A protein has these predicted regions:
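Aromatic (phenylalanine/tyrosine) cluster motif
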Residues: 13-15, 141, 176, 218, ...
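Short loop/helix-cap segments at secondary-structure boundaries that form the rim of catalytic
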Residues: 312, 327-334
Length: 344
């Protein structure tokens, strides 16, 4: 079934349903289960200030599904009705015309990246009675402010300090926030979600605090201005593509707490010249250093490990090892192996 949002509504922030007929619902697709409606899609040609009805065919609208409004780039505002409890993953992704959105009191769950790539979204607003989420300076948090959910991509300012109460940075939280050059992460943060800072191309340096144990997949991928990053001794896992295409990085220190380096973790870090792999690392994923064209020296402080396929593809590295280390042959991962004493 398909249904349309009301266009050009002259009553902002009205959450009650306006009279609708089937002919007015041609832009939306929805499903109905147990008398509850989930909006699943919207025609990308829909334009104007749109109001989602609170009922469709006599059934309450309670959910906005994953990707429901993805790519609807001609909607400057969308009114979500009271009664909606769930907003799905990337539900409003790439709504590039959207400048503000208000989340009603009834919402209890907001999916990852729900407002990602909304390039003109400067603030997120929330109903004063919502007990699950709060907004501070336009940034979306859970009520206890332990989770930073979304930093709007269109928000102005080059510097941002994450509040001290935050312990988790959500997946896609700062995705594509290219205006930011500096982000301060407080000491209490223990979790950084997948793609949390991906494509923050203005970000120049960042310190990951002690207590973080895992750096999520793609979490700092394509941060092309990043020249310095500090990884603490609490980190055990560097996720897949965690620092891929960080072309500004020239060096990085991996602490001896790390046991796993994910696939493509440092791929296309073209200006990375050297790296030291501690003895603690037992697993290195395929393509981990692919296309690191400037990487001339990789020093291993322990025994030889199983190399993932293509680990040094398009790289010209030389491997250096300790003389007492075991399992090494004349080549590893397709690159020559020498003793550390032979290092230039």
């Amino acid at each position: 079934m398909r249904c349309a949002l009301l266009a050009a509504v002259s009553l902002p922030f009205v959450f009650t349903a306006l009279p609708l007929h089937a002919a007015d619902l041609s832009d939306l697709t929805w499903t109905t289960t147990d008398d509850q409606v989930t909006i699943t899609a919207c025609d990308r040609g829909a334009a104007g200030e749109l109001v989602i009805p609170d009922t469709i065919e006599g059934n309450a609208v309670t959910s906005i599904g994953n990707r429901a409004f993805r790519g609807c780039d001609s909607l400057p505002s969308i009114t979500i009705p009271e009664g909606v409890t769930s907003i799905g993953d990337i539900a409003f992704q790439s709504c590039t015309g959207l400048t503000s959105i208000t989340i009603p009191d009834s919402v209890t769950s907001i999916g990852d990246g729900a407002f990602s790539r909304c390039t003109n979204l400067t603030t997120i607003e929330i109903g004063v009675g919502n007990v699950n989420y709060t907004v501070v300076d336009g940034v979306l948090f859970n009520t206890k402010m332990t989770l930073l959910h979304t930093y709007p991509e269109g928000k102005t300012g080059a510097n941002y300090t994450i509040p001290d109460s935050v312990t988790s940075i959500g997946a896609l939280a700062f995705w594509f926030c290219r205006k930011l050059t500096s982000i301060t992460i407080p000491e209490g943060v223990t979790s950084i979600g997948d793609r949390a800072f991906e494509v923050c191309k203005g970000l120049r340096s960042i310190t990951i605090p002690e207590g973080v144990t895992s750096i999520g997949d793609f979490s700092f991928g394509q941060c092309t201005s990043l020249t310095r990053i500090t990884i603490p001794g609490s980190v055990t896992t560097i996720g897949d593509s965690a620092f891929s295409r960080c072309t500004g990085l020239t060096s990085i220190t991996i602490p001896d707490s790390v046991t796993r380096i994910g696939k493509s973790a440092f791929a296309v870090c073209r200006n990375l010249t050297s790296i030291t792999i501690p003895d603690s690392v037992t697993s290195i994923g395929r393509y981990a250093f692919q296309s690191c064209e400037g990487l001339t020296a990789v020093t291993f402080l322990g025994d030889a490990r199983k190399a993932g396929g293509g680990i040094f593809k398009y790289a010209t590295s030389t491997i250096y090892r300790k003389p007492e280390a075991k399992g090494w042959r004349s080549t590893w991962g397709g690159r020559p192996v020498k003793l550390i004493s032979e290092k230039p």
